[in-house]
Amino acid sequence: MIDDDGYRPNVGIVICNRQGEVLWARRYGQHSWQFPQGGINPGETPEQAMYRELFEEVGLNKKDVRILASTRNWLRYKLPKRLVRWDTKPVCIGQKQRWFLLQLMCNEAEINMQRSSTPEFDGWRWVSYWYPVRQVVSFKRDVYRRVMKEFAATVMPVQEVAPPRVPPAYRRKRG
């Protein structure tokens, strides 16, 4: 589903722990990392799409998280020309995203990136709040900066009580 301007509706998910760190996921078979994200299906609300993507990509359910915030507006990024599929109609030139900030409410051992038959990620780790802005692929950097800036005031008070943690090395897929 591509809008009239060539953007695919999408949701992005920032999951934070009580220390204010965020879940950073490694793309399957690659050396690139990002937040979970995915398309909105016809008839789905952004929130419904977020919960579906949360389960497919991270293996968590609604009961495992709490919504702390969502972006006020759609945020857009354009794909580099080399990534645009010019032979498909309508042509998708980028993504327009609604972002959700979630607090992890369950034990992090519940995270399982192998729930889907085609996993998006094969590892994850907790990183400092602003780390993703510097590390994400360049064409997504402005959106990440805007998302993290919008969510910052909400995340900082969450850092009070520490839940149980898995050792800090990035976690491999389960399955």
From Swiss-Prot:
Its cofactor is a divalent metal cation. PROSITE patterns: NUDIX, NUDIX_BOX. One of its GO terms (cellular component) is cytoplasm. Its EC number is 3.6.1.-. It holds the Pfam family NUDIX. Belongs to the Nudix hydrolase family. RppH subfamily. Accelerates the degradation of transcripts by removing pyrophosphate from the 5'-end of triphosphorylated RNA, leading to a more labile monophosphorylated state that can stimulate subsequent ribonuclease cleavage. This is RNA pyrophosphohydrolase. It comes from Yersinia pestis.
